[in-house]
Amino acid sequence: MVAARARRRKRASVTQLYSTCKAAGTCPPDVIPKVKGTTLADKILQWSGLGIFLGGLGIGTGSGTGGRTGYIPLGGGGRPGVVDIAPARPPIIIEPVAPTEPSIVNLVEDSSIINSGSTIPTFTGTDGFEITSSSTTTPAVLDITPSAGTVHVTSTNIENPLYIEPPFIEAPQSGEVSGHIFTSTPTSGTHGYEEIPMEVFASNVTTGKEPISSTPTPGVRRIAAPRLYSRAFSQVKVTNPDFISKPSTFVTFDNPAFEPADTSLSFEEPTDVAPDPDFLDIIKLHRPALTSRRGTVRFSRLGQKATIRTRSGKQIGARGHYYHDISSIAPAEELEMQPLLSPSTNNYSYDIYADLNEAETGFMQPTQTTPMLRSPFSPLSTQLPSLSSSVSSSYANVTIPFSTTYNVPIHTGPDVVLPTSPTVWPFIPHTSIDTQHAIVIQGGDYYFVAVYIFVTQTP
């Protein structure tokens, strides 16, 4: 039978052996070098550390404490940084309290200096205080009136030599003397100031041309007409006149009790077929508009359809222009204009008219002889041919002569045509000397041609 082997006990550590065997001097030979770090491995590290730096890794036979400097964390430098250490506060001294002393500690130390305050006055007399009284008859009133000084009174008189009014009788009025002199009632004298006419800015009388705003803008601002006939709107003509008064009956079968005619109409998502197929899927009808196009008065509304509905709830659809022609505008009638006066028989450009009632006595002589043409420079004389003028008194067209310097007869021009005119030049119309006639001249341009005849004098 094999005897049981005794259990091996663990040897004590080097530090424990060194603390017990150092005093007795019985330390094993391998304990003291390990404690003092003089083993062969320690010496090799010391010799190699003279040439290389191992970073304080603590390689040796001692405990793994990282050597004298300890372990360095990864990512740090080779040497630890300088750490600022704040000065330490002085420790608080705890004083014990005896059982017989109170537990309340005074925060303020007792002072040995006692302040007794101000000194108490001492009275030596025995009569006490002396009371005196005084009386006066002057009231305690402060004089706030300033000291008297000189007062300068000035007056201003303005005269305008360019405009002087007639003097008015005014009497002087007293009691109104200040820096300027004014008169409140008409008194004797003449105005000493200039009267400026006042202009009325605000008046109840309006002319219709006043601006309606404080800063009127010149010109006329025109409101842009709705673009109902663009490509964005489909044109739908509605022939039923109920579209003007009851537009909702074309979308739904329900007829509301009150339906405003000038507002937009909104409808819920249609579930049934619309009464009118043109209004299918209509969800909104905008407010109406009256326009005139191509000779008609047109009632229009814009309609919004909801044909497609997205997942987000947005409705997409086309827009249409629904219109109904109310009435046609007839063209303006052309009225034939009738003349108010009968057409005149005289179509001449230049005519001279005389009063027929007074002209009857002036045209009774049948003939007229042409006078002699004499020149003041020559004794010669020239006899012009004698022509007859048979102008009837029933005609109103009479040509009158104009006087000339050398008694030259005046003949009719191409613009004046007589009823019975001779073809031989010249023609001298008959004039009446004793009868005055009222003459009316109608025309625009008159030309006076002076005819001069010069006769040479022979020696």
Swiss-Prot record:
<dbReference type="GO" id="GO:0075521">
    <property type="term" value="P:microtubule-dependent intracellular transport of viral material towards nucleus"/>
</dbReference>
<dbReference type="GO" id="GO:0042025">
    <property type="term" value="C:host cell nucleus"/>
</dbReference>
<comment type="subunit">
    <text>Interacts with major capsid protein L1. Interacts with E2; this interaction inhibits E2 transcriptional activity but not the DNA replication function E2. Interacts with host GADD45GIP1. Interacts with host HSPA8; this interaction is required for L2 nuclear translocation. Interacts with host importins KPNB2 and KPNB3. Forms a complex with importin alpha2-beta1 heterodimers via interaction with the importin alpha2 adapter. Interacts with host DYNLT1; this interaction is essential for virus intracellular transport during entry.</text>
</comment>
<dbReference type="GO" id="GO:0043657">
    <property type="term" value="C:host cell"/>
</dbReference>
<dbReference type="Pfam" id="PF00513">
    <property type="entry name" value="Late_protein_L2"/>
</dbReference>
<dbReference type="GO" id="GO:0003677">
    <property type="term" value="F:DNA binding"/>
</dbReference>
<keyword id="KW-1160">Virus entry into host cell</keyword>
<dbReference type="InterPro" id="IPR000784">
    <property type="entry name" value="Late_L2"/>
</dbReference>
<keyword id="KW-0946">Virion</keyword>
<feature type="disulfide bond">
    <location>
        <begin position="21"/>
        <end position="27"/>
    </location>
</feature>
<dbReference type="GO" id="GO:0044177">
    <property type="term" value="C:host cell Golgi apparatus"/>
</dbReference>
<keyword id="KW-0238">DNA-binding</keyword>
<keyword id="KW-0597">Phosphoprotein</keyword>
<comment type="similarity">
    <text>Belongs to the papillomaviridae L2 protein family.</text>
</comment>
<keyword id="KW-1163">Viral penetration into host nucleus</keyword>
<keyword id="KW-1039">Host endosome</keyword>
<dbReference type="GO" id="GO:0019028">
    <property type="term" value="C:viral capsid"/>
</dbReference>
<keyword id="KW-1177">Microtubular inwards viral transport</keyword>
<dbReference type="GO" id="GO:0044174">
    <property type="term" value="C:host cell endosome"/>
</dbReference>
<feature type="short sequence motif" description="Nuclear localization signal">
    <location>
        <begin position="1"/>
        <end position="12"/>
    </location>
</feature>
<keyword id="KW-1176">Cytoplasmic inwards viral transport</keyword>
<dbReference type="GO" id="GO:0046718">
    <property type="term" value="P:symbiont entry into host cell"/>
</dbReference>
<comment type="function">
    <text>Minor protein of the capsid that localizes along the inner surface of the virion, within the central cavities beneath the L1 pentamers. Plays a role in capsid stabilization through interaction with the major capsid protein L1. Once the virion enters the host cell, L2 escorts the genomic DNA into the nucleus by promoting escape from the endosomal compartments and traffic through the host Golgi network.</text>
</comment>
<keyword id="KW-1015">Disulfide bond</keyword>
<keyword id="KW-1048">Host nucleus</keyword>
<keyword id="KW-0167">Capsid protein</keyword>
<keyword id="KW-0945">Host-virus interaction</keyword>
<keyword id="KW-1040">Host Golgi apparatus</keyword>
<keyword id="KW-0426">Late protein</keyword>
<protein>
    <recommendedName>
        <fullName>Minor capsid protein L2</fullName>
    </recommendedName>
</protein>
<dbReference type="GO" id="GO:0075732">
    <property type="term" value="P:viral penetration into host nucleus"/>
</dbReference>
<dbReference type="GO" id="GO:0005198">
    <property type="term" value="F:structural molecule activity"/>
</dbReference>
<feature type="short sequence motif" description="Nuclear localization signal">
    <location>
        <begin position="454"/>
        <end position="458"/>
    </location>
</feature>
